[in-house]
Amino acid sequence: MIDPIDGTMNFVKEKENFASMIAIYKQGKPYMAYIYDVMKDRLVWGGPALGAVYCNQTQLPAPKQHALKDGLVAISCPMVLANYRNVVEVIKASSGCRMVGSAGIEFINLILGKHCAYLSYLRPWDFLPGKILGETLGLSVKTIDDEKVDVVSSSVVLVATKSAHTEIIELVNR
């Protein structure tokens, strides 16, 4: 699965905060993924085939398992404006909310430990590379209903540290 310009509006309007992404599945199983932050010349890559994730040539550790109160969350603006599934309470319980407008860049922020959660309505080409990389590093990747993500369907996807995941699922199901 390829997303050549993830964050198209950012590419057009800002000339930054966009990424190119590739997810490779082999015999129906996640194999490798690549997210390239074009403007920062930063390639995050790896997957189950390697059992590791790298940023350029540096192997990355698993992100710290920050609780929701100790981390930043990224939640899509339409979800916040509609308070979809009580997401405003998620924001209040966190250290703050950020939204870049590119799933690839949001996944990089999670993988590098800058955020503890990302919640957005995503299409497969938006989430598959981040799913492969995130799960390789021990992040939780589920639907907002705490179900397995269907890799061929669009859905509201929650990617988070395991601690933040548990707290967010409780808040969005109140």
Model-derived regions: residue spans:
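Oxyanion/phosphate-interacting regions
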Residues: 88-91, 108-174
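Flexible, acidic active-site loops/lids enriched in D/E/S/T/G that coordinate Mg2+ and/or position polar
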Residues: 1-27, 34
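Proline- and acidic/polar-enriched loop/turn elements at helix boundaries
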Residues: 7, 36, 102, 122, ...
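Acidic beta-strand-loop-alpha-helix segment within the catalytic core
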Residues: 21-108, 154-174
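Buried hydrophobic positions in well-ordered alpha/beta secondary-structure cores of metabolic enzymes
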Residues: 7-8, 73, 110, 134
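Residue-level preference for nonpolar/small residues embedded in alpha-helices
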Residues: 16, 82-83, 126
